[in-house]
Amino acid sequence: MEIHGISGFAGFLSIFGLLLLGGFSYWRYVWFFRNPSRHPPPGKGLLSPADGTVVYVETVAPAEPVISIKRGIHISVNDIVREHLHEQKVLIGIFMSPFDVHFNRAPLSGQIGSVRHHPAVTRNLHMGAMHLRTILRWPPLFRSSLHLLQNERTVTRIDGEFKDQPLSCYVIQIAGGSVSGIDSYVREGETVARGAIFGMIRIGSQVDLVVPFAAGMELRVRPGQKVRAGETVLIE
């Protein structure tokens, strides 16, 4: 009886293990790459480039410290973009959990001005602190997120128009510690439509949007808010 009980329990564990492995494999190789259709709203408002949770919304000068991730460690827009920008900027950060859609979409229509890849300073750090804070809604959502300074990223500049004025926006795809690649589907000089897919990041990651601040801009999102790529209006 005892041997039969042990054998039955072992069989249960085997079946459970197979189901767990099958579920993980489906998530990792099928569900993760899902690409639901998106329908950009009418108008010319700047759209979210990513699905996820907004972790910061700031309007600052490029070299001015935007956020403090730890005591004595501050981050500016220039640190995130890895360029020396000028004039006041709007910065919106979006954390993408492993369960969000990971295809990234253009905030506006325009021409690809540049696509630049920057390797990690040493190695990619995990985004566990930010993930936990977004789950618990524990502000500030960016605290202890050293990946903002450290990690690999691809910076795509899109040159378009906003309210009939020229506008260049930067979309920054920041890799997480478990990321297996940042994909870019566009090249410099090509055109992209508002809400169209231009790339993706594999597994958990972050996408930031940087645009020049202009009079009359209205920020439509706040930290902690959920957004959808190609559909949620960030700025009007």
Give each language-model segment a name:
Residues 1-236:
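Contiguous, well-folded functional domains in the mature portion of proteins
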